[in-house]
Amino acid sequence: RIMTKSEKLFERAVKRIPGGVNSPVRAYGAIGEAPRFIERAEGCYIYDVDGNRYIDYIDSWGPMILGHNFPAIRESVLKACEKGLSFGCATEIEVEMAEFICDRIPHVDMIRMVNSGTEAVMSAIRVARGYTGKNKIIKFAGCYHGHSDAMLVSAGSGVMTSGVPDSAGVPKGCTEDTMLAAYNDLGSVETLFQQADGQVAAVIVEAVGANMGVVPPREGFLQGLRALCDQYHALLIFDEVITGFRLAFGGAAQYFGVTPDLVTYGKIIGAGMPVGAYGGRRDVMELVAPAGKVYQAGTLSGNPVAMAAGLTQLKYLYDHQEIYTELEKKGELLYGGMGKIVKEKGLNYQMNYVGSLGSLFFTGQPVVDYVSAKSSDTVAFAEYFKKMLNMGIHMAPSQFEAMFLSAAHTDEIIMETLDAVKLVL
């Protein structure tokens, strides 16, 4: 068999890049074959270096909510580039971005731009500790909050996929103040609060679990977290790197009607450029340097080209909020349709979804947390993924990642996808 261009590129890549990729899940490690190398993208399609076209349900892991290569975003980036790529100084567009978000999201009084979701989480946790004078953080098994040392505890995402529970190189001291609760289990959270004896600075949670596959919060779970944080004088941090500006313009906080003290953003806020952000209550955010004593900095934070991309996307989403209603309908058509196919075929699998995020779990038990997600048959998933890929449908190469819908996925494309699912399952 003649090697494909993707296979040849991967062969070259592994000699110079650890594992051949710059982020583990891209390696198709759970699938057992070389990853596809992508050359270009348009709308809901991506094209690999071998000339194959795929319907894409990764959306660059979430940022491309309007579809790939959206004209207005592309033009804003090109226009910004004409003025220079980076100045190392304050710019007007940073102010515009901050004002645009804070004026429209009630729980964000102030916001600070960074370069990734990981940076946003690291910073939010530092601020929470600085504000409360406490050290302990409660997180949930299966929730992924980036690759900072303190958060690599039962972290979901690529950590789950590779079968590595934590990470080498993380000293015990970095995680000894991280307390682990069970997602969707308020009792486990209250127990940790009681054990911590008033030393919990914050609870951090993916408002919708999206890195152990999609796991929706049970009714009352997020509200219960808010109440517990109030009771024990801790901050509530919503990690909205995935859900921010996706479930609603105001993210999961708006979608579920629960107000966090701090929130982290990524993905959509940068429209495909490396952008993260953290924000929230004014009295908390005023502790960030140079206004306060909690230090955080970044050479490229608030990069003008990245801000141009992100602000253009956010303005479009705010001005066209019918997109969120349409994405809900698309989610029902695709994920609801997949669930019906599973039922019609008598398969004992679970279809979880919230809005435009969805996961088909190859397990017979309802998936409500990390433990039930891990019961999935990853071998069966790998076979499903390969068959779908061969039919021109590109999904996350892991049982424990989400599918993403965009505004560019038409009903016709969704029906084409469902036809493939019928043949493959």
Residues covered by each model-derived region:
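Conserved N-terminal phosphate-binding loop of PLP-dependent enzymes in the Aspartate aminotransferase
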Residues: 2-425
